[in-house]
Amino acid sequence: MPVDFNGYWKMLSNENFEEYLRALDVNVALRKIANLLKPDKEIVQDGDHMIIRTLSTFRNYIMDFQVGKEFEEDLTGIDDRKCMTTVSWDGDKLQCVQKGEKEGRGWTQWIEGDELHLEMRAEGVTCKQVFKKVH
């Protein structure tokens, strides 16, 4: 049985986010705005089907996918690229590989207690975010 990621999560910390955005070639103005945001995550999980909504006052991003199946991800509003994305289970963690223009792009997501941990990677840069479950 996979881990239950269902819930609404509020951001607690966001380490190295601006450097991560720089690695994605996000322009300086958007990096500064994005770095000030404290987005929430809303995750709806039905077995291996997941919808992850990243919600902020500036912009929302919705990722709808089936674990284990490659799909084209449109990152308009983030770095305006498209990539071929696969999310897989690695024990109790979700591992995402995003194949495209940027080397080593992807993320890992897992739960510790009532916290959601997310590590995002691109071009050798890692950003670490932590969220607390509120419901």
UniProtKB/Swiss-Prot annotation:
It is found in: Cytoplasm; Lipid droplet. Residues 22-32 are annotated as: Important for interaction with STRA6. Its main location: cytoplasm. All-trans-retinol binds at residues 41, 63, 109. The keyword Plastid does not apply. One of its GO terms (biological process) is retinoic acid metabolic process. One of its GO terms (molecular function) is all-trans-retinol binding. Keywords: Cytoplasm, Lipid droplet, Retinol-binding, Transport, Vitamin A. Pfam families: Lipocalin (PF00061). GO terms for cellular component: cell body; cytosol; lipid droplet; nucleus. Belongs to the calycin superfamily. Fatty-acid binding protein (FABP) family. Forms a beta-barrel structure that accommodates hydrophobic ligands in its interior. Interacts (only as retinol-free apoprotein) with STRA6. Cytoplasmic retinol-binding protein. Accepts retinol from the transport protein STRA6, and thereby contributes to retinol uptake, storage and retinoid homeostasis. This is Retinol-binding protein 1. It comes from Rattus norvegicus (Rat). The gene is Rbp1.
